[in-house]
Amino acid sequence: MGSGIMTETLTDSWLVGLLCLVLGFLLLQLYKLVWGASSRAYKLPPGSTGWPLIGETISFFRGINSTAQPRQFIQEREQRYGEIFRSNLFGRSRIVVSVDPEFNKHVLQHEGRQFQANYPKPLRNLIGKYGLLSVHGDLQRKLHGAAVNLLRFERLSVDFMEDIQNLLHITLAKWEAKRDIHLQEECHQLVLNLMAKQLLDLSPSKDTEEICEAFGHFSEALLAVPIKIPGTKYARGFKAREFLIKKIYESIEDRRQHPEAVHNDLLTKLLKEDSFSEEIIADFILFLLFAGHETSSRSMSFAIKFLTDCPRALEELKAEHDALLKRKGNLKNQKLNWDDYQSLKFTQCVIHETLRVGNFGPGVFRETKEDIKTKGGFVIPRGWTVYVFLTGTHLDEKYHSSALKFDPWRWQPHLQDQELLKNPSFMPFGGGARLCPGMHLAKMELALFLHNFVTKFRWEALQDDKISYFPFPRLIKGLPIRLRLRE
């Protein structure tokens, strides 16, 4: 009897296996049929779709995680297909990847007309439906305008400069007392404190420490496998989002309860706008907190890493800042003004090179609103995704000689911002209607940080550290360093 049951069980298992095999074969044929039918109507860019469903996603992430050559995925396909090629990434079988600088510029400049932002749904779910990556049309223009207004020249040159330098003096004194620090983690908290002050009028406290910790989980979830099971990075990201939104709503309720209190922050200004609901405001503030501290904090720790590995650049940077201090009378804790900041020419070179090599925003997603013709007579059909892969051009030897080398001197002939904005092979802040509104703030934060850090400290690396670009650019060990006061 036992033998009969076993035989029956084995037969059932064999049948189930056969059915799965047949079903898999049929799905593969259906995939090829649908793909073939959609492809035959157009002269699509050349490329490969990889495996069904997963496509080339694993190969893409394996490539960008290479510390030796983060362009590996692109390089192999560019040699085979050219700078604009078809792929199958992030669950999207109808996607074209571009590392063509001129085409990338065209895509970004024609937002709203020929293209519109269309990020993967798991990412949009985390960011929120009213985050700047998710919204379109009039609402996008209004929210983008609110961010631009917050960061207008008058506020940057006075309020932000004052707040950044006050916070730097307090923070660097704490680092001096600690002596041994993980710079990446400390910079995250530093910039989060600044953004929390400007957006929510929150001073450094246990609240801002908890917010910074939550953003760590939130960031990890953005490119995690989108499975919302307890314990996964994606699930932790949603829990972090709930916590962060709750904190923002608490600030909103506090303003409602105490209308007489004076707050010079963005939240107060948004609450006075009749056109913005509390849900829109909460998602928008969450996005700005994330975007405003992510690039700036990473650029600070990456800049110190690059300078540590390039003593010649560090010495030239120190000389520039020491000369500025001397011009200002070598007064202790002397604050810089806007003209001082503008005078730091080599510092600007260091900033641009840090942004180029660091690649803190690797790419942007756009959906075609009409059929798009590309060079070579190829067509990207309406409704397809274009992935503008900025890392692909930033680290391309055709546009930047010795592209993997940190070389700030390469920027000396190109220091005017307007000239840099016209360079399609260098777009660390995107472009067009969605040009990052915090571009000038991020550069100023990094310049003021470098000024205070290199004039106050000498340092040594406690461990050798390397850069990983997966799931986002980071220093694997967090850049542990030992600080000493300069004599």
Curated annotation (Swiss-Prot):
Disulfide bond annotation, renumbered to this chain: none
Molecular function terms, GO-annotated: heme binding; iron ion binding; monooxygenase activity; oxidoreductase activity, acting on paired donors, with incorporation or reduction of molecular oxygen
Subcellular localization(s) per the UniProt record: Membrane
Enzyme Commission identifier(s): 1.14.-.-
Protein's GO biological process: brassinosteroid biosynthetic process; brassinosteroid homeostasis; sterol metabolic process
Enzyme class of the recorded protein, top EC level: oxidoreductase
Necessary cofactors: heme
Its membrane topology: Single-pass membrane protein
Highest taxon of the lineage: Eukaryota
GO CC entries: membrane
Record key words, sorted: Heme, Iron, Membrane, Metal-binding, Monooxygenase, Oxidoreductase, Transmembrane, Transmembrane helix
InterPro entries: Cyt_P450 (IPR001128), Cyt_P450_CS (IPR017972), Cyt_P450_E_grp-I (IPR002401), Cyt_P450_sf (IPR036396)
Sites where the protein binds heme: C436
Residue intervals passing through the bilayer: 14-34
UniProt family annotation: Belongs to the cytochrome P450 family.
Record protein name field: Cytochrome P450 720B2
Organism from which the protein derives: Pinus taeda (Loblolly pine)
